[in-house]
């Protein structure tokens, strides 16, 4: 570029300082490690606030790292407690220069509004859609989407919540999908024969139940499932869910999938 002759440009990457990491319950070790490793490797200190429902994995990871003797004193801290109390302190404290958050959209928006000029890294949820085209390998598509719908009882940000299936294959796809769902084994996750376990607590299961009941009351069709037993909610498939229902607009975070038929994109 004219005027740039004999000039040198370069980037200098420097640690940001203290990173605040706020993690969810659904992957209590993996998602903590995802934040701790890069933060330390880049020369930062990090304060981890794990979900109050699953703090032990973060504590054990920190214990292992600190007992190794490889970390300078004080660069890794784990603080447990309510997110509304401890999380707010981390987000607002000017000494914390970056917030890394994995969790729901509403909490992410709240953090963004409070963080000021801090750097922010977020992994947020959604009511994730999958499109199945007419040339899809039917059996593979069914198997992949059943697993995507009900893995971890739907408690992950990659949960298949909305399935848009082309009209040309809709009927055979749905028949196979329902049959595979009916064969899904629900029970104790310590049993290797179990496909799907319970939700994190009964409040979460009741929330899923309420969202499904709302959709059914609004005219949705229940193809399979729709039953709660304590913290367990059966793998559930619906169609004709009205767009105004919370199930069509919000992340359900449970084992529920909605089927849609389409002809053109």
Regions flagged by a language model, labelled:
Residues 255:
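Glycine-rich nucleotide-phosphate-binding loops and adjacent flexible coil segments
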Residues 252:
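Cofactor-binding beta-sheet edge motifs in enzyme active sites
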Residues 67, 74, 106-242, 261-265:
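ALDH superfamily catalytic-core signature
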Residues 248:
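Short, solvent-exposed loop/beta-turn-alpha elements that line the ligand-binding surface or hinge
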Residues 1-140, 262:
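Rossmann-like NAD(P) dinucleotide-binding subdomain of oxidoreductase/dehydrogenase enzymes
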């Amino acid at each position: 570029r004219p005027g740039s002759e004999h000039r040198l440009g370069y980037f200098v990457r420097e640690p940001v300082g203290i990173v605040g990491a706020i993690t969810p319950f659904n992957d209590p070790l993996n998602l903590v490690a995802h934040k701790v490793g890069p933060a330390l490797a880049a020369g930062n200190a990090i304060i981890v606030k794990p979900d109050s429902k699953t703090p032990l994995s973060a504590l054990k990871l920190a214990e292992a790292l600190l007992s190794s003797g490889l970390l300078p004193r004080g660069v890794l801290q784990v603080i447990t407690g309510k997110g509304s109390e401890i999380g707010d302190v981390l987000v607002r404290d000017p000494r914390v220069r970056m917030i890394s958050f994995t969790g729901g959209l509403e909490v992410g928006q709240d953090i963004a509004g409070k963080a000021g000029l801090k750097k922010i890294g977020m992994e947020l949820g959604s009511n994730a859609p999958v499109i199945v085209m007419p040339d899809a390998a039917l059996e593979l598509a069914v198997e992949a989407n059943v697993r995507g719908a009900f893995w971890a009882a739907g408690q992950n940000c990659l949960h298949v919540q909305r399935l848009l299936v082309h009209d040309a294959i809709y009927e055979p796809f749905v028949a196979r999908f329902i049959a595979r769902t009916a064969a899904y084994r629900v029970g104790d996750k310590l049993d290797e024969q179990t496909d799907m376990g319970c939700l994190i607590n009964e409040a979460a299961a009741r929330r899923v139940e309420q969202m499904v009941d709302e959709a059914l009351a609004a005219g949705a069709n229940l193809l399979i499932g729709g039953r709660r037993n304590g913290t367990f909610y059966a793998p559930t498939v619906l169609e004709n869910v009205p767009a105004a229902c919370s199930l069509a607009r919000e992340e359900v975070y449970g084992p529920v999938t909605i089927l849609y038929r389409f002809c053109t994109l």
